[in-house]
Amino acid sequence: MKIVADENIPLLQPFFGSMGEIHTLPGREISNQHLRDADVLLVRSVTKVDERLLENTGVKFVGSATIGCNHVDLDYLTSRGIGFSNAPGCNASAVVEYVVSCLSVLSEQLGFELEDKTVGIIGRGEIGGRLERALTLLGLEVKSNDPPKEAAGEQNLFSLEEVLQCDIITLHTPLTDSGSYPTRELLNATIIENLRPDQILINTCRGEVIDEAALKGRLQKGDGLTVALDVWNNEPAIDVELAMLCHFATPHIAGYTLDGRTAGTEIIYQHLSRYLGLPVRHKLGQFLPEPPLRRMAFSSGVDPDWALHTAIRASYDVRHDDSQLKRTLRLDAPMRAQEFDRLRREYRVRRGFDRIKIELKGGKADLLATLSAVGFNLSSK
């Protein structure tokens, strides 16, 4: 069996090596020619999977090691009887941790307390739902907007207009062009122009959900709007001027914990095994190394807010990835695009909060609750 796979999918050989011959390629370069004699295709979000890619190939199963599947023509796969799996929820915790890190660092830089802010979440799917729960447990007032879920009967949802009045707006929608609730340029020029100077905007879903030209024009005014972008139009050839105007600009790595990325590999491995009628022989724990930061300890007298922010930034500080991307923006256009992909391909080992054990010596209940809210693994002595 021949398996063609995006070279950025981790642990390909340990999970799939016994199934067949693996051929790896940069995800953006996978073409119809590469798939003529392939049986299985494994991708990430940078590969558009449709009739043009798969026509006259032998591909019988497509696995996408990603939460979303906007890049896959599911109707075409169904019409051809091609099996499919993505990995819903695989990196949801990682994206939540990215947003929490942004808020932690911004609270210090801009001088505010988290519990004094309201947060508007646009899209209450797997990621948005987890973020809502975490921020609520941290004491923030959270309002979520998700019209499809509201139409399906979910409760405690708010209108887009209400959510856009929150101090912090964070985007977690799929990219859709059709249906009752299209999300392409959901934040259009009018909405962007009406954002308050004291608001914070974070986007970790899809770049096309925002009108980037309008956002760049707004930021060029320099009136105080704070923006953190991890996703962009036309990746990897992103808008340099917009990136330089962002408070934080990162190369589509919000979900890139080792745990989240490898969980995606494990999920599509499990689905392919079942599709082929094979036993599921491997588990993720067999292959993951110990995290570089395994343990932190706080004493009973520690200030809870200080402990929270220290733990968050020690585990993941968004400023590192921001500086890495902005360092590439001085290069010429072809080299910038290559560096964007290289930063993703060679991304450092970043582990999830739940891989770090925090010991609280005589810890207070409020500190236990606070650290637990964002996913840390706790023990109290």
From Swiss-Prot:
Substrate binds at residues 45, 66, 256. NAD(+) binds at residues 146, 173, 230, 255. It is an enzyme of class 1 (oxidoreductase). Pfam families: 2-Hacid_dh (PF00389), 2-Hacid_dh_C (PF02826), DUF3410 (PF11890). InterPro entries: D-isomer_2_OHA_DH_cat_dom, D-isomer_DH_CS, D-isomer_DH_NAD-bd, Erythronate-4-P_DHase, Erythronate-4-P_DHase_dimer, NAD(P)-bd_dom_sf, PdxB_dimer_sf. It is found in: Cytoplasm. Keywords: Cytoplasm, NAD, Oxidoreductase, Pyridoxine biosynthesis. Pathway: Cofactor biosynthesis; pyridoxine 5'-phosphate biosynthesis; pyridoxine 5'-phosphate from D-erythrose 4-phosphate: step 2/5. SUPFAM superfamilies: Formate/glycerate dehydrogenase catalytic domain-like, NAD(P)-binding Rossmann-fold domains. It comes from the Bacteria. GO terms for cellular component: cytosol. The active site is at 206, 235, 252 (proton donor). It catalyses: 4-phospho-D-erythronate + NAD(+) = (R)-3-hydroxy-2-oxo-4-phosphooxybutanoate + NADH + H(+). Catalyzes the oxidation of erythronate-4-phosphate to 3-hydroxy-2-oxo-4-phosphonooxybutanoate. Homodimer. This is Erythronate-4-phosphate dehydrogenase. It comes from Hahella chejuensis (strain KCTC 2396). The lineage of its organism: Bacteria, Pseudomonadati, Pseudomonadota, Gammaproteobacteria, Oceanospirillales.
